[in-house]
């Protein structure tokens, strides 16, 4: 049993083989039972199974106890027989177990190997089946695609056939109308000719009747009238023949004209195509030249804009320098004027003090002689003269001082007026500068586009944006950018902080990618539409060629119809010629009657 358990462990390879193992164990048990039965049958029923043997042994013992006649020798012989039987049974069992175990091992190993091979074969078969199925599916898909393409081609062919049918119908209608027109013209011509012939015949008959009335006149005038009438009839017949010939010529000319028109149309179409191709080439050349000129003009404009910006900067700097110089000059002038004013004031004060001192001294001198009456009269006269002279000098000095003061006041007023005028002019210059500054604050569309590009690049860093605008101040740039954001022309990229700026950049990149994809899609759609248009143009050209062929055929048919009409007219002319012969016979008969 231990060997059998070890073998079962060795044989257990996979859970899938557990059923085989159980079956093998059942086979082992059945083989054991069969071997025991075979052994019993071989020994002719001498050996009993172990359970029966034990029962028999007990029965013998019971019999021994019951029967006193049994001997001890018989008991020993029975025991020996039992031991030999047991040994033989054990040997047989061991042999049968070993055989069965070996057989089971071999069977299990072979079965497991066969099962493994079978499983591998099954897997390979399944893989092959899957590959075949995939190939079949691919073939089916390809067939479906081919069928779809064929259906599309069939629809295109059907459309082309419908177009051809419509074109053929139109051509047939046109040919039918042309034929009807030609037939109507021919009918009208024939009717006119017949009417003319009938009228001529009626005139001839009337003339014949009149001639018959005047038969037997004595003067022979009726004969002259008859001859004149016959001549008139002959002339009418000749005119009819000429008219018929002219009609035939006209018909031939019409046919020739139709053919020439068709040929001219072909030639004209070819010339038109060539002219259009030449125009396209010339237009392409002109477009290239215009593009080059536009690029040159753009370059010149950019260069001139740079020069203008530099020129404006130099002008602004020169204006500022002039303003600073004027301010410095006005300050220096005001200082010099103040110094002159102070000097004039000091002079006036000194003169006034001198005059006052002199007046006081003179009063003292004038009082002194009155207080000293002891002096001579000469002295009095001298003193009076001197006093009068002094008084006159005093008045003259006062007048001079007053004149000087007036002159100084006038000078001061003039200087003040000049300074006020200068200040006003400086203020005006400042106002003009502000106005010029405001004029530079006007924004153009190009500047707005430039502003949008810089805003998308730098965000709300107005310093970086202002570095690209030399004409504007930083405040103007910022205010204009905020105005564009308020209007909606610019998006507020970082409304809540720096993080939004990064998001804005990512959004811009995504938008740029979307725009590129849209442009690619639009280009592909345009190319597809162009290809469709080219195919339709190709089909239209083919249809036009077919139509031209059909028109040529219809013209040939018309030519044949015209020939038939000409033949008919020729027959009518023969009839008129026969009528002419009949008339000539009538005239000869008339002459014979006269005779």
UniProtKB/Swiss-Prot annotation:
User: What is the annotated localization of this protein?
Assistant: Nucleus
Entry's InterPro entries? Homeodomain-like_sf, Myb_dom, SANT/Myb
What are the start and end residues of every segment in region (Disordered)? 1-47, 55-74, 82-266, 319-445, 494-595
Q: Does the keyword Transcription apply?
A: yes
**Which stretches hold the DNA-binding feature?**
462-485
Q: What residue spans carry the Low complexity bias annotation?
A: 19-47, 90-212, 225-264, 349-368, 376-420, 517-595
Occurrences of domain HTH myb-type (ranges): 435-489
Biased-composition ranges for Basic residues?
324-348
The superkingdom listed in its UniProt entry is Eukaryota
Q: Which GO terms describe its cellular component?
A: nucleus
Chief place where the protein resides: nucleus
Q: Where is the composition biased (Basic and acidic residues)?
A: 423-434
* Entry annotated with the keyword Nucleus: yes
Q: Acidic residues composition bias: which ranges?
A: 60-74
Q: Which GO terms describe its biological process?
A: mitotic cell cycle; positive regulation of transcription by RNA polymerase II
Q: What Pfam families does this protein map onto? A: Myb_DNA-binding
List keywords of the entry alphabetically: DNA-binding, Nucleus, Transcription, Transcription regulation
What GO MF terms are annotated?
Answer: DNA binding; DNA-binding transcription factor activity, RNA polymerase II-specific; RNA polymerase II cis-regulatory region sequence-specific DNA binding
Q: Which protein are we looking at? A: Myb-like protein D
Show the taxonomic lineage. Eukaryota, Amoebozoa, Evosea, Eumycetozoa, Dictyostelia
């Amino acid at each position: 049993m231990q060997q059998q358990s070890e073998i079962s462990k060795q044989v257990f390879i996979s859970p899938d083989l557990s059923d085989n193992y159980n079956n093998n164990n059942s086979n082992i048990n059945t083989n054991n039972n069969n071997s025991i039965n075979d052994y019993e049958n071989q020994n002719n029923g001498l050996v009993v199974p172990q359970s029966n043997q034990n029962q028999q042994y007990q029965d013998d013992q019971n019999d021994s106890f019951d029967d006193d006649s049994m001997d001890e020798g018989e008991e020993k012989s029975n025991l020996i027989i039992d031991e030999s039987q047991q040994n033989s049974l054990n040997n047989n069992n061991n042999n049968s177990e070993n055989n069965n175990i070996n057989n089971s091992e071999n069977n299990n190993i072979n079965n497991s190997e066969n099962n493994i091979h079978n499983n591998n074969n099954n897997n390979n078969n399944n893989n092959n089946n899957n590959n075949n199925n995939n190939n079949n599916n691919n073939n089916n898909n390809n067939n479906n695609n081919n069928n779809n393409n064929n259906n599309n081609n069939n629809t295109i062919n059907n459309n082309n056939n419908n177009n051809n049918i419509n074109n053929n119908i139109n051509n047939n209608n046109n040919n039918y109308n042309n034929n009807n027109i030609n037939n109507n013209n021919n009918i009208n011509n024939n009717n006119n000719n017949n009417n003319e012939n009938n009228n001529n015949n009626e005139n001839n008959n009337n003339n014949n009747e009149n001639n018959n009335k005047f038969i037997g006149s004595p003067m022979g005038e009726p004969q002259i009238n008859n001859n004149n009438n016959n001549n008139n009839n002959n002339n009418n017949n000749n005119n009819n023949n000429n008219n018929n010939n002219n009609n035939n010529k006209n018909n031939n000319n019409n046919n020739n004209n139709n053919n020439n028109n068709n040929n001219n149309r072909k030639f004209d179409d070819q010339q038109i195509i060539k002219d259009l191709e030449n125009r396209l080439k010339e237009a392409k050349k002109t477009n290239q030249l215009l593009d080059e000129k536009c690029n040159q003009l753009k370059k010149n404009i950019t260069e001139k804009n740079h020069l203008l910006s530099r020129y404006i900067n130099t002008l602004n700097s020169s204006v500022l320098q002039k303003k600073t110089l004027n301010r410095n000059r006005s300050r220096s002038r005001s200082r010099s004027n103040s110094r002159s004013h102070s000097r004039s004031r000091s002079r006036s004060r000194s003169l006034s003090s001198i005059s006052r001192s002199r007046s006081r001294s003179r009063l003292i001198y004038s009082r002194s002689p009155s207080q000293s009456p002891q002096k001579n009269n000469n002295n009095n006269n001298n003193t009076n003269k001197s006093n009068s002279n002094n008084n006159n000098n005093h008045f003259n000095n006062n007048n001079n001082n007053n004149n000087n003061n007036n002159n100084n006041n006038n000078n001061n007023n003039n200087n003040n007026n000049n300074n006020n005028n200068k200040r006003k002019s400086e203020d005006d210059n400042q106002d003009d500068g502000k106005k010029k500054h405001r004029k530079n604050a006007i924004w153009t569309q190009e500047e707005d586009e430039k502003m949008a590009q810089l805003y998308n690049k730098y965000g709300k860093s107005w310093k970086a944006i202002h570095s690209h605008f030399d004409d504007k101040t930083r405040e103007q740039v910022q205010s204009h950018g905020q105005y564009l954001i308020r209007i909606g022309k610019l998006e507020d990229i970082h409304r809540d902080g720096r993080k939004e700026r990064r998001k804005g950049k990512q959004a811009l990149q995504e938008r740029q990618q979307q725009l590129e994809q849209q442009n690619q899609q639009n280009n592909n759609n345009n190319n597809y539409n162009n290809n469709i248009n080219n195919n339709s143009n190709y089909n239209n050209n083919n249809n036009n060629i077919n139509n031209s062929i059909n028109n040529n055929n219809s013209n040939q048919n018309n030519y044949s119809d015209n020939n038939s009409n000409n033949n008919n007219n020729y027959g009518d002319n023969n009839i008129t010629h026969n009528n002419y012969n009949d008339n000539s016979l009538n005239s000869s008969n008339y002459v014979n009657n006269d005779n």
